[in-house]
């Protein structure tokens, strides 16, 4: 499968019109034979890409004490319980934060307050924080999430995810796609039989089918 993925990626990169900006590379995934009105059939998976995402990933950490101090080294923002309460009183600011942030991480003891103050904002966006367990290292967790993408179908048969940037080259992008396909197949009831098609493209380029 790796060779056919690489062929599709190479075609997508070669056929993309030259632009004066750095294009991202995405895949579109089409599902079939699934009742996506049933939430249990929907895809919602975090996947760590072996070659990275090729872009900055915005991560916000809710933490206090030593964890907050260490998180300052790697996170884009570190917020404490007072900040959390302030966000709960400012719906516009909370929505802006949710829209600008790729992933949230929170100490487990703050999750209840996050649900109370931000649940109605983060929940519908699929951005409730990943709970940080007592033995988890915040620096390792954030660094791993910087290379993470979210596969999220919601109730749609077609959904998209980022797999890299054009200047990463076919090998790295193909490795990322291979990992995503394997995770996707493992998540689907009938594996590859539930996949109707996968297409790879740059931001402005033509889509090329990835054989599965």
UniProtKB/Swiss-Prot annotation:
Domain of life of the native organism: Archaea
Alphabetized CDD domains for the sequence: Ribosomal_L1 (cd00403)
Gene Ontology BP terms: regulation of translation; translation
UniProt cross-references to Pfam families, sorted A to Z: Ribosomal_L1
InterPro entries reported for this sequence: Ribosomal_uL1, Ribosomal_uL1-like, Ribosomal_uL1/biogenesis, Ribosomal_uL1_3-a/b-sand, Ribosomal_uL1_arc, Ribosomal_uL1_CS
MF annotations from Gene Ontology: rRNA binding; structural constituent of ribosome; tRNA binding
A GO cellular component entry from the record: large ribosomal subunit
UniProt xrefs under Gene3D superfamilies: 3.30.190.20, 3.40.50.790
Coiled coil: none
Keywords for the protein's UniProt record, in alphabetical order: Repressor, Ribonucleoprotein, Ribosomal protein, RNA-binding, rRNA-binding, Translation regulation, tRNA-binding
Entry similarity comment: Belongs to the universal ribosomal protein uL1 family.
Function: Binds directly to 23S rRNA. Probably involved in E site tRNA release.
Cited NCBIfam families: PRK04203.1
Assembly: Part of the 50S ribosomal subunit.
Protein name: Large ribosomal subunit protein uL1
Biological source species: Halorubrum lacusprofundi (strain ATCC 49239 / DSM 5036 / JCM 8891 / ACAM 34)
Gene responsible for this protein: rpl1
């Amino acid at each position: 499968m790796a060779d056919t993925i690489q062929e599709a990626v190479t075609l997508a990169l070669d056929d993309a019109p030259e632009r004066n900006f750095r294009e991202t590379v995405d895949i579109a995934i089409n599902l079939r034979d699934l009742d996506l009105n049933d939430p249990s059939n929907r895809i919602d998976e975090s996947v760590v890409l072996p070659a990275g995402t090729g872009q900055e990933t915005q991560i916000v950490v809710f933490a206090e004490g030593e964890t907050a101090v260490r998180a300052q080294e790697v996170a884009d923002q570190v917020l404490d319980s007072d900040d959390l309460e302030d966000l709960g009183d400012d719906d516009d600011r909370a929505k802006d934060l949710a829209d600008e942030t790729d992933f949230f991480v929170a100490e487990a003891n703050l999750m209840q307050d996050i649900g109370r103050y931000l649940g109605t904002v983060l929940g519908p966006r699929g951005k409730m924080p990943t709970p940080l367990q007592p033995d988890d290292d915040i620096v390792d967790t954030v660094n791993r999430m910087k290379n993470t993408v979210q596969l999220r179908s919601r109730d749609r048969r077609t959904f998209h995810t980022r797999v890299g940037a054009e200047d990463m080259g076919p090998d790295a992008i193909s490795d990322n796609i291979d990992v995503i396909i394997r995770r996707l197949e493992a998540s689907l009831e009938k594996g590859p039989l539930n996949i109707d098609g996968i297409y790879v493209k740059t931001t402005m380029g033509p889509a090329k089918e990835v054989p599965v």
